[in-house]
Amino acid sequence: MRHNKHRASLGVTVEHRRAMLSNLAAALITHGRIETTLVKAKALRPFVEKVITKAKQAAAKTDKKDALHLRRLAQSDVRDETAVTKLFNETYKEFANRNGGYTRIYKLGPQRIGDAAEMALIEFVKADDPGYKKSKGKKATKAKGKKAKATPAAEAAAAATTEAAPAEEKK
C-alpha cells in the first residue's frame, strides 16, 4: 500500500529517480542554474539542499575524518566527482551565512511543446540576495468614497497661471 509516501515518483523506478536527481544535482552545481520541468525542480530542491548542508558541515569540522566521511556521503548522492569537488571547494562558501533555502525555482511561461509539461528554472540563491520579505504593514485598502475634487478657487488659480504664461511670451 502507498501510505504516507511524500515524494514525487516522477513516473520512474527508484534507481532511475536516484540517477536522474544525481545528474540534475551535478548539472546544477556545475552551472549554477538549469532549466527542467517543474516537478523535477521541486524534487531536486531538497536533494541538493541536503548535499549543500553536508558540504557546510564538512567545512565546519576540525577532524579530517569527519569531513572526509561527509564528502563521501555527498559523493554517493551526486556521483559526479568534479561537481562534488566544486561544491566542497567553492560553492559552499556562498551559503556560509544562510540556513537553508539555497535554491530558488522560477516557473517559466509557456508549456513545453510536445508533452505540455510546465517548465521551471532552478538556480542557487546568491550570497548577497536578501530574498523575498513579506511586508509587516497593513495592506492597502480601497477608498470607500470618491476622491474629492479640487476646490473651484484652486482650479481658477491654476487656469490663470497657464493663460498668463503664453501672454507674457508674446510681448
UniProtKB/Swiss-Prot annotation:
This protein's source sits in the domain of life called Bacteria
Q: Which GO terms describe its biological process?
A: translation
GO cellular component assignments: cytosolic large ribosomal subunit
Biological source species? Opitutus terrae (strain DSM 11246 / JCM 15787 / PB90-1)
Residue stretches of biased makeup (Low complexity): 150-165
- Gene expressing this chain: rplQ
Family the entry assigns: Belongs to the bacterial ribosomal protein bL17 family.
Q: Tell me the subunit arrangement.
A: Part of the 50S ribosomal subunit. Contacts protein L32.
One MF term in the entry's GO annotations: structural constituent of ribosome
The protein's matches in NCBIfam families, at most eight in alphabetical order, are given as: L17 (TIGR00059)
Stored Pfam families: Ribosomal_L17
The name of this protein is: Large ribosomal subunit protein bL17
Which UniProt keywords are present, listed alphabetically?
A: Ribonucleoprotein, Ribosomal protein
Region of interest: Disordered:
130-171
